[in-house]
Amino acid sequence: MKSSFEFSNLCGTVYQQGNVQFGGNGDTLYSPVGNRLAVFDLVRNVSFAMPFETRKPIMRVAVSPKNSHLVLVADEDGHALLMNTARRSLLAHMSFKLPARDIQFSPDGRFLAVTHGTQVQVWRTPNVFVREFAPFVLHRTYVGHSDDVISITWSKNSRFFLSTSKDMTARLFSLDPVPGFRPKTFTGHRDAVLQAYFSLDERTIYTVSRDGACLTWSNKDSQELMQEESGDTDLGATEATNDPENYVAFARWGVMQRNYFHQANTQVVCAAFHAPTSRLVVGFTSGLFSLWDMPDFQSIHALSISQDKISSVAINESGEWLAFGAQRLGQLLVWEWASESYILKQQGHFFDMNTLAYAQDGQTVVTGGDDGKVKLWNTVSGFCTVTFSEHSAAISQVEFAKQGQVLFSASLDGTVRAYDLVRYRNFRTFTSPNPVQFVSLAVEPSGEVVCAGSADVFETYMWSVQTGKLLDILAGHEGPVTSLQFDPAGSGLLASTSWDRTVRLWEVFKRSGATEAMQLNAEGLALAYRPDGHEICVASLDGHLSFFDPQNGASRGVLDCRRDISGGRSVNDKVARRNNAAGAAFTSVCYSADGSCVLAGGNANYVCLYDVRERVLLKRWKLSKNLLLDGTQDRLDSRQVTDAGNVALINDLSDEDELTLAERQDRSLPGAQRGDLSKRSTRPLARAKCVRFSPTGQSWAAASTSGLLLYALDTGSTFDPTDLDMELTPQSVRSASLAGDALLALLGALRLSDPILLVEVYERVKYQEVPLIARQLPQLYVAEVLKLVASRLDPSSESPHVEFHLHWLSSLFNAHGEKIRELGHSSYAPVLRAAQMALNELRANIKTVCDENTAAMLYVYNGLTARHEQQIQDTL
């Protein structure tokens, strides 16, 4: 099995903090998700996360106006990354030394303005015509504010820019010295000035402050007074004054109008201005936003879209779509104000997600979190498709039925619920005679029986899905039943593990109800069945993975994994680094689709992949590099330790004036492990609560502190040739294919493992030769050809040769069906699932087209019939 899994996408979280930004023609939205950047394509309805991480959560996002794929992100410490979102490549690193409250590219794309405390720094951006050693070169530093600078706005000609500050003023600077010009100060606000904007003709300036005031500034004098105000009779100064490009520099700006938003008990948090339409949108702490027409200051639209404050707002290029981000609730919204409809409405889990499960098609993932929500995510688009909120407590485990569109969830509220994924409703609720907390769940392969293990009475409950009645109560464990799973082969065996250091096998469908107990060296935390049902893997508290034969209960081996999962340090660790592995353990295990590997994750920042046969570690992935999470650093910095404790645990009150009254109140209880972890005095632990392999074997997912992380095989960068020789080259393969030797060319392309060449040779095979080539194909390459056919059959490949691919599939099954059936649960399982998924999606697409065509033909037929009857009546 290949282990070259790379980061693919991040689901479960759509927005955390910072500013949202539109790119391109306004159909792309950039949103900071922790220390990663998420990209949402609003036209194609897909999203993905960049594979690069900053050191801390992203604070600002800036998009180049000359190339919307060039995006600069900066974290809380001022460390920035310049990346190309189209190629998903990292171009440059940069450190601004201080937190950047705002970053803006100039309209010509040649300069980058960055807030630097009370100063503004302007940097020259990389240029293909000028070779420089550093990617960014400091052009000039601008001073004048007495408090932190909040925002920057450029003029259209990139010669001037406005800056706003906490000192309740805005200032106008010139990029380069202009004869006779001195920086201008705009005063008159009573609170911090959040934003300042130029009008389209740059004859008017608008400033917005936190207290809800909007001031309109314009020129008070004529052109003659502007020249007198310059006070310089030098020829260069006169030419600069008469230059229309310098109008904003020599105008005598004064307050022409004072307007107020009149929102009681609220403050302005963010604002955005669209110059071509002169529309101003403002977000408030109450979750309300309002749209105003400037300079008349007429209210166009007002709507409450969130229960908490709106943290960021952006307007697309056409001015039709408004993007909002709500930090506390993790909401991301795109609103079309003209039609009053949502273009995008996404929200992640409010607290951590505890569990996940893959559907049989591999394209749907369900997650359950501490907020009591069950969410379904599409792995292709990255969007949440439906949310179930019937549970009133944290979700402990979710499972799909192997057959049918049914989803089960177990919760600490004492219920197990079944959901119909066709009608999206909760059609069955299972409860115990006495209220208990369910912490584990298992579904029988036929989907007719569901079992749940409790944490307080140490019993396992079994219900019938059809009737909803309790069938049996399995007693025997002496601790919380932490994990349950049925034999996937359908033998009826139920495996369970508990804190009582045992693994039990229950024959639940036999009258005897015999049980068999196998001893562990420590408390059992998780277990998994191999897909063929011939082996069980159990994770225990001592950091071991134990393997058992479920047929006779014999132990097949023990794997010590404590050193593999340890390594992360917490800021309040009191033990030495060499003793840090004592509490490391896996809390979730899962077999690969072919059963050759085990994926494990737990209370550490790593997910490990082990080879079952050799009992060795194949690969280890680090989930996050976010320094604000505990467990991401291998060594602690002694410079961060003070007499009052670690600096990271001390509340920073420097920005308390920007918080609302509700945010300043600390409602956390001493010793509480759950609750609002957005408080700055708490540090979440980087860990993986649940890991699962995709049924296709091409990807795996982890429910981590950062969200739902998806890792997939990078087929484009993986070169895995077999049986090479000097004569085997791409040119020789193409020559054989053009000469008509299809089998030789296909085998050569398979041995070279070149995906582009393989598709070219495969689709050049003649239709009538497919059955013959399928019969002559060696058994060694059948799985690879099936994988190729499944990938080309998938509608996402945009291949028009549907009948050709179906003919290949039928011929392979006719020629090698017996061997495929024999190995269907092991080596061929991922390929068969991929083919089934492609066929199901193809069938759904064809059915949709046929239904639409049938409805259209019925409409035409009914119209013709009515017209014919009307003609008959007119004749009579």
Whereabouts are the PLM-identified features?
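A structural motif specific to WD40 beta-propellers
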Residues: 8, 47-49, 89-92, 131, ...
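Beta-strand-rich domains and repeat architectures in extracellular enzymes and scaffolds
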Residues: 8-35, 56, 266
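WD40/WD-repeat beta-propeller blade N-cap
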Residues: 10-15, 52-58, 94-100, 142-149, ...
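Loop/turn segments within WD40 beta-propeller blades
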Residues: 20-26, 62-68, 103-109, 146, ...
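Conserved strand-to-loop turn within each blade of WD40 beta-propeller repeats
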Residues: 32-33, 74-77, 114-118, 163-167, ...
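WD40-repeat beta-propellers
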Residues: 37-41, 80-84, 120-126, 170-175, ...
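Short loop/turn segments immediately following beta-strands, especially the blade-tip
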Residues: 124-132, 174-178, 218-235, 550-556, ...
